[in-house]
């Protein structure tokens, strides 16, 4: 992999809060996209597709079934430093879906940066996970020039885990590798990449170190990867 490629998600080195992640964060505003105009904050994440997106301490994940989240291996591994907690569709103004402890992690056996995270059904606040999220459906496929959106938690600790959505275009697909130009930053690792129907095409895992808005990279969900995920959804 090009040395300019950086993993987006290993930056949340802070103390946990009641939300599950960081405290004593500055109240000063933070710029998420200095040059891009295709990114917006999602202030109310209580409806689909936003309520299928969850925050890890240093990244993002997407709900695909009962108690089942898809994210990156590097996010799932690093999250145990932060007490294995996941926050369901947290946003700045909308009602969040609760904070959930991780039950177990199933890593994809191949080279792809893909992992399944199962959470306990009841949150620390007594909420039911499956009643407070939606399940994102898989896309049948995707191709170059398809419009996509990326939803997640860029610079999560710095922004107090505000949710953001960016849009862009798929530039290249080769096997399980996908390149696109939707804006992303550290914290977007594991973010769902959705098509125009809000169906799941894949997840983001890395980006260009030269210019984060130039190009980003994702795990494209081939039939084989979708089968792996579906076989690991809790029954």
Curated annotation (Swiss-Prot):
The gene is splA. Its EC number is 3.4.21.-. One of its GO terms (cellular component) is extracellular region. The lineage of its organism: Bacteria, Bacillati, Bacillota, Bacilli, Bacillales. Its main location: secreted. PROSITE patterns: V8_HIS. Keywords: Hydrolase, Protease, Secreted, Serine protease, Signal. It is found in: Secreted. It comes from the Bacteria. Coiled coil: none annotated. Residues 1-35 form the signal peptide. This is Serine protease SplA. Pfam families: Trypsin (PF00089). It comes from Staphylococcus aureus.
């Amino acid at each position: 992999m090009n040395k300019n490629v950086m993993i987006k998600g290993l930056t949340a080195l802070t103390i946990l809060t009641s939300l599950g992640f960081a405290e004593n964060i500055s109240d000063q505003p933070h710029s998420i996209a200095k040059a891009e105009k295709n990114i917006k904050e999602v202030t109310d994440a209580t409806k689909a597709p936003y309520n299928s997106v969850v925050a890890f301490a240093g990244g993002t994940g997407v709900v695909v079934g009962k108690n089942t989240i898809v994210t990156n291996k590097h996010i799932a591994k690093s999250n145990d430093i932060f007490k294995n907690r996941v926050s369901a569709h947290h946003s700045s103004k909308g009602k969040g879906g609760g904070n959930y402890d991780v039950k177990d992690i199933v890593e994809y056996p191949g080279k792809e940066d893909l992992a399944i995270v199962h959470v306990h059904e009841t949150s620390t606040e007594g909420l039911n996970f499956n009643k407070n999220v939606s399940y994102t459906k898989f896309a049948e496929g995707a191709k170059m020039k398809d419009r996509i959106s990326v939803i997640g938690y860029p610079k999560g600790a710095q922004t107090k885990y505000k949710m953001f959505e960016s849009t862009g275009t798929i530039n290249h697909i080769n096997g399980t590798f996908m390149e696109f130009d939707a804006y992303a930053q550290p914290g977007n690792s594991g973010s769902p990449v959705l098509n125009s129907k809000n169906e799941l095409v894949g997840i983001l895992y890395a980006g260009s170190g030269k210019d984060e808005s130039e190009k980003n990279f994702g795990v494209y969900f081939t039939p084989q990867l979708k089968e792996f995920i579906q076989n690991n959804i809790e029954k």
